[in-house]
């Protein structure tokens, strides 16, 4: 299995940053930034780089989201992140970005075509929100 690392960026008010992959790659309509590490790249560095490249958001890591999340060929791990700066520039792998409330994020993730990827992203979202709440108290969104 290949490894990938990504980030769930959550604003101080509990808004979730989602990306719309170009051409809805692999059936993903809205998802989180993630990707494979470059040579000798640490998981945290990979996640920060992928978030910046795919969303244009510079972020800082708040903590590791518990668990690993498997699809057919990849095991992904995610980090909870706080936004630092939005550069408004993202790579060609992304056609749009969007901030969403937790409920909106759930609805957007349900648009993904592949059930396994939908389940993965819903699990990631649930665990990210639980970690966010443990660090910051209840959501104010």
For each feature predicted by the language model, list its residue ranges.
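Short, charged/polar surface micro-motifs in flexible loops or helix N-caps
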Residues: 13-16, 24-26, 38-39, 57, ...
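A short, structural micro-pattern
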Residues: 1, 72-73, 91
């Amino acid at each position: 299995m290949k490894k990938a690392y990504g980030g769930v960026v959550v604003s101080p008010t509990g808004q979730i940053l989602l990306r719309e992959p170009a051409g809805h790659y692999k059936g993903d309509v809205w998802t989180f930034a993630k990707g494979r590490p470059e040579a000798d790249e640490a998981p945290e560095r990979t996640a920060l780089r992928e978030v910046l490249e795919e969303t244009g958001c510079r972020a800082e890591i708040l903590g590791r989201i518990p668990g690993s999340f498997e699809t057919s060929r990849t095991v992904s791990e995610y980090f909870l992140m706080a936004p630092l700066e939005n550069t408004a520039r993202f790579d060609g792998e992304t056609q749009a970005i969007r901030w969403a409330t937790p409920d909106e994020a759930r609805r957007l993730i349900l648009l993904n075509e592949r059930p396994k990827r939908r389940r993965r992203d819903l699990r990631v979202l649930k665990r990210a929100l639980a970690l966010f709440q443990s660090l910051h108290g209840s959501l104010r969104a």
